[in-house]
């Protein structure tokens, strides 16, 4: 005949005895807290206590638990579970209960705590996602409201329209001829120094048009005030003439070229890009490949799209190349704008007269970006770095062997080289099998001194490697590793989950400080 309620009645009686202190044969210390209990109950519910009492049962009246891992409230909760079979977290953190259960090897409690932590993490992730969605919606609404409020402010006035009509007049062939045929170019800055392909140029032009038409765009009509300010900043925007020199005097040519270029600059943009040089001549001739790309702009508002480009002044190049470029551009302005007409490539060599203008080519600070190997000049350090890589790419490959008069420690058997004779001697032991380090206690020999030091612990009976979970000590780090794998694997994994959830240091960083680093190799 079975009595189903017998087990429950037994637990109830044991719980009453524990509260009364009747027949309690052990005391568990967690920090300053004392817990009276029965050894049989503790050993039946916890593998930690089972192993603790297995060896010396009569000498283990007091049990000390690591208060850094097990807290007093968490152990009190687990102790109630042992005697009553009920687990009530109350207001305790689940992480503390998980750490205590892992320390005591109560794996059923560990599984429950892990499940609750996963549910908690999922709930927090869902709530965070909802908050982010709500905030993104509110940001979109604010953006739309700001765009509608700035709509009226972005509309140009009547005077601006008149100025815009004056500025948007494109010069014809006669204008280009009478105005010394000056062309104004802009070199790309560091952030835009990578050459664009044809498809990218089309996309950039289309994007510029959309930006100019959008109500939220920061580009507006070019007023008379902005033109005046551009003339005042002549000391910053250093310019050079790209065209054929006319019969005017030096001062008149400079003034006319500067004024005429201001009008051309508002309507056209020639982007000069420096391509990578693959080789260098023996005579150190300064040569640089340029891709000149000219985009005809219909509206003046798009003249501010490429603000990052700085206007620079280049030395004169060959007459026939410039004339062909001007004629080609004039013909393209009469036809519809197509990708073929928008991109015009011209490859020329820089004249040696560029070198006197080096301080004006580059940044306003006067920095010189010149290749130290071939003396070529570049507009930015980024392009210079790309050019230098072409030199070093040619030198890649097998390292040249040192001169014959330089002695390098080399193994005579396998030909391997070393930095010093000490490492060579250690390497030679792998071929000869020599074991110069001998233990004075047992006569065992080793190839390396650190192996002898590790072996000496066997004779001294020292146990420097301590387990953080059960405070057992071991002579070798490998024994400690096998012990953790066998008895504390669940605890290590659970604390790994805990550290990832709470953003704590990894288990390897704070649980095994006293053990050897070879444990985790």
UniProtKB/Swiss-Prot annotation:
Q: Which CDD domains match?
A: BTB_POZ_ZBTB18_RP58 (cd18324)
Q: Name one Pfam family in it.
A: zf-C2H2
* Keyword terms of this UniProt record: DNA-binding, Metal-binding, Nucleus, Repeat, Repressor, Transcription, Transcription regulation, Zinc, Zinc-finger
Q: Which GO terms describe its cellular component?
A: nucleus
Q: List all Polar residues biased stretches.
A: 214-230
The places in or outside the cell where this protein is found are: Nucleus
Asked whether the keyword Nucleotide-binding is assigned, the reply is no
Do you know which PANTHER family this protein is assigned to?
A: ZINC FINGER AND BTB DOMAIN-CONTAINING PROTEIN 18, ZINC FINGER PROTEIN
What's the protein called, per UniProt?
Zinc finger and BTB domain-containing protein 18
